[in-house]
């Protein structure tokens, strides 16, 4: 579908060599806007949904003053942050201080280029899409480190050090989760990973949700979800910005839009981790049962992603913050050994007569 739109636009401007040469660049800009604009809207309203859901879980009202049912609260928050003065510490490294937030949010937005929204709907149908996303998202930690170092604050620097150690630790476990999914799917292409989950005895019987990867790879799915919470520095793994000890971590010296960009990067990463988990383990745009195939795939993808994101919020409302040593122990002594063992189990499973992914 994306290719058809591109070719149609190219034919319209082909009469002029100048517009024909400009069209590919313009098309890429249009695709970027088509992803970034809705994503920023989803990120803004995720903050409202989080506050509403936390309010419900704590038996209180969430934001309900700005607009009907508080629906304009994200716009009010954004306007407030836009009007705040941006203050740089006198001893901060000026250029790097500005670069930090940009480096934090760019990977969270750029990784969406390889996410498929349907069998023929992806900005870039990359054969090594999963590898590309891993490479892009691994850059995000540099934004945090740069912000912590450039702030010239001991609290910010301590938060940056914690962030780098935590994100690198859980990236290893997530990498092994990706490797297991690649093994059972036989591809790093995210579209092919989704299509591989539409095969099998249960899918043929109309119960597609029982053929998705979450069931045979349940331990890997659980490790991925918890590692995703840690990767996005969400509660209970938010010691990077632990309010009770290091104030706001690497963001302590930021105000106005600098702080807002870090905030947006965190929530954009939540959406990315959620939709990636849905793509790898929950069938992507596939309907759970054949009787519901008439519902468009993008609705299923959005609904599943919304449920996974809501799980992030439920975890925040339920669990206390872990100590830093507990977080490191969980990553290195539990998740990495578990994923390595399951890597061997799945390898043997694929070579056995009981291989269900044939």
Swiss-Prot record:
Keywords: Cell inner membrane, Cell membrane, Membrane, NAD, Quinone, Translocase, Transmembrane, Transmembrane helix, Ubiquinone. It catalyses: a quinone + NADH + 5 H(+)(in) = a quinol + NAD(+) + 4 H(+)(out). NDH-1 is composed of 14 different subunits. Subunits NuoA, H, J, K, L, M, N constitute the membrane sector of the complex. Its EC number is 7.1.1.-. PANTHER family: NADH DEHYDROGENASE SUBUNIT 1 (PTHR11432), NADH-UBIQUINONE OXIDOREDUCTASE CHAIN 1 (PTHR11432:SF3). Belongs to the complex I subunit 1 family. InterPro entries: NADH_UbQ_OxRdtase_su1/FPO (IPR001694), NADH_UbQ_OxRdtase_su1_CS (IPR018086). This is NADH-quinone oxidoreductase subunit H. It is a multi-pass membrane protein. One of its GO terms (cellular component) is plasma membrane. The keyword NAD applies. PROSITE patterns: COMPLEX1_ND1_1 (PS00667), COMPLEX1_ND1_2 (PS00668). The chain crosses the membrane at residues 29-49, 95-115, 130-150, 167-187, 209-229, 258-278, 295-315, 334-354.
């Amino acid at each position: 579908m994306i290719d058809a739109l591109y070719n149609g636009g190219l034919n319209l401007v082909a009469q002029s060599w100048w517009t024909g040469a400009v069209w590919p660049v313009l098309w890429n800009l249009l695709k970027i806007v088509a992803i970034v604009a809705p994503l920023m809207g989803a990120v803004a309203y995720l903050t409202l949904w989080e506050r509403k859901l936390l309010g419900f879980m704590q038996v209180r009202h969430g934001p309900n003053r700005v607009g009907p049912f508080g629906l304009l609260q994200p716009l009010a928050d954004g306007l407030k942050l836009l009007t705040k003065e941006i203050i740089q510490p006198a001893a901060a490294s000026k250029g790097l201080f500005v670069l930090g937030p940009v480096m934090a949010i760019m990977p969270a937005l750029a990784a969406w280029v390889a996410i498929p929204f349907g069998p023929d709907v992806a900005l870039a149908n990359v054969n090594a899409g999963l590898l590309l996303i891993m490479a892009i998202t691994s850059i995000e930690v540099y934004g945090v480190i740069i912000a912590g170092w450039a702030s010239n604050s001991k609290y910010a620097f301590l938060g940056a050090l914690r962030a780098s150690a935590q994100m690198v630790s859980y990236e290893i476990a997530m990498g092994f989760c990706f490797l297991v999914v690649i093994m059972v799917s036989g591809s790093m292409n995210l579209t092919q990973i989704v299509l591989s989950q539409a095969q099998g005895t249960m899918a043929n019987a109309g119960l597609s949700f029982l053929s998705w990867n979450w069931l045979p790879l349940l331990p890997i799915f659980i490790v991925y979800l918890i590692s995703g919470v840690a990767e996005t520095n969400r509660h209970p793994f938010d010691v990077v910005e632990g309010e009770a000890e290091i104030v706001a971590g690497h963001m302590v010296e930021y105000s106005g839009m600098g702080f807002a960009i870090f905030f947006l990067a965190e929530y954009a990463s939540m959406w990315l981790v959620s939709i990636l988990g849905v793509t790898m383990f929950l069938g992507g745009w596939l309907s759970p049962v054949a009787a519901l195939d008439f519902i468009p795939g993008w609705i299923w993808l959005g609904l599943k992603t919304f449920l996974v994101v809501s799980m992030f919020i439920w975890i925040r409302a339920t669990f206390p913050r872990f100590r830093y040593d507990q977080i490191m122990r969980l990553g290195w002594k539990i998740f990495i050994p578990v994923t390595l063992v399951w890597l061997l189990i799945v390898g043997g499973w694929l070579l056995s007569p009981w291989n269900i992914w044939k």
